[in-house]
Amino acid sequence: MDLTVEKSGNLEGTVKAPPSKSYTHRAVIIAALAEGVSEIRDPLIAEDTLSSLNACRAFGIRVDEGDAWTVHGSGGELETPDDVIYLGNSGTTLRLMTSVAGLAENYTVLTGDESLRTRPMQPLLDALRPLGVEALSSRMNGLPPIIVRGGLRGGSTSIRGDVSSQFISSILIAAPLTEGVEVMVEGDFISRPYVDMTVDVMERFSVPVDYSEGTFRVEPAVYRGLDYTVEGDYSSASYLAGAVAAAGGDVLIENLFRDSRQGDRIILDIISDMGAEVRRGEDHVRIASTGELSGVSVNLHDAPDLLPTVAVLGALATGRTEIGGVEHARYKETDRISTCAAELRRLGVDVTELPDGMIIEGGASGGTVWSHGDHRLAMAFTLIGLREGITIRDAEVFSVSFPDFPERMMQIGCRMNLS
């Protein structure tokens, strides 16, 4: 489907940020491993998070869906799945459930769509081996499908920190249901806030995590079921905030907490540096802008999902925008550095691609771009449309993480149509 965005200005109103995708994944998986019943309130109901919910069900977990998800915890006693578990496009589910599969008896097979089957997994597979899990790529190339044989007993292991923080989160989530685990992080520790979110949810479910001198330690423990409310998502809110910054206006975004551990909250600092006015409350943010933006230099080492948003804002800004620290963005749904640069060039933007980012000279025009099947590209490029007009091909992919994206954008005055 095509998303056509018309020039829009003077955005105004109040809009609620959608629930956090990252926190929803972690909450439902940990609730599935807990003793007792948990209620996950205000979960993000989207393709990716439903992949995690359905993966939990494949291991015999009962989950009742409604306005909240009621999860009947297993206490770590998982059934062997009856069939291959298909995860769609959800890389988070793939990574987190690989270690969880090590808690089940016998074999589990995890796979997904064409994009998911290009996601690197070998560092996690190697790190699980010293902990008692035999896990391998069915094609012996480090990529899904992944075959996991249960047997996670615990122990000490090490893992590279420069490919995906989800590998670390994966082991930590399963760790308390073993004899105890030590994980030493080797090299550069990218996207650390995502691991902080994992630890946050683990501790909410009564499992402490120790981190010192580059090593995580988790002792044997029991997750305790509880009522958990999912906070708003700064990644998805970046499109709402970016829309106001780009088109101009004054908008209140609710459900964004000042004390959040989400690394993507840095988007507020970035748009402020570019020229927007940002006022933060305890649970909301007000963005005001004239639409006049200036280029910035940013390091997105801990917030790689912001790359498309910052790139398109840079294309609308006066002067140069430099983005660095995101080499790991090449291993997302697409090689986001390459695909972002290619689509910006379609719109007449001067882009220099770097190994870990890009340099953008502002000056985008309208036109037609392709999503490459990447939800974040599809949503980010709407911001150029608010100023110049744009058509985004294969845009329906936004449903992966933000199913009512067009409706929430139109709520604040953005003019767009999906057809």
UniProtKB/Swiss-Prot annotation:
Catalysis: reaction(s): 3-phosphoshikimate + phosphoenolpyruvate = 5-O-(1-carboxyvinyl)-3-phosphoshikimate + phosphate
A GO cellular-component term linked to this record: cytoplasm
Pfam families on file: EPSP_synthase (PF00275)
Gene3D superfamilies: Enolpyruvate transferase domain
Residues that bind 3-phosphoshikimate: 21-22, 26, 164-166, 191, 305, 332
Main location, first listed in the record: cytoplasm
Catalytic residues in the record: 305 (proton acceptor)
Origin superkingdom: Archaea
Keywords of this entry: Amino-acid biosynthesis, Aromatic amino acid biosynthesis, Cytoplasm, Transferase
GO molecular function, one term: 3-phosphoshikimate 1-carboxyvinyltransferase activity
UniProt pathway: Metabolic intermediate biosynthesis; chorismate biosynthesis
InterPro entries, per database record: Enolpyruvate_Tfrase_dom, Enolpyruvate_Tfrase_sf, EPSP_synthase, EPSP_synthase_CS, RNA3'P_cycl/enolpyr_Trfase_a/b
Listed EC numbers: 2.5.1.19
Residues that hold phosphoenolpyruvate according to the record: 21, 91, 119, 166, 336, 376
Subcellular location: Cytoplasm
Subunit record text: Monomer.
Function (record text): Catalyzes the transfer of the enolpyruvyl moiety of phosphoenolpyruvate (PEP) to the 5-hydroxyl of shikimate-3-phosphate (S3P) to produce enolpyruvyl shikimate-3-phosphate and inorganic phosphate.
Family to which the UniProt record says this protein belongs: Belongs to the EPSP synthase family.
Protein name according to UniProt: 3-phosphoshikimate 1-carboxyvinyltransferase
Organism: Methanothermobacter thermautotrophicus (strain ATCC 29096 / DSM 1053 / JCM 10044 / NBRC 100330 / Delta H)
Gene: aroA
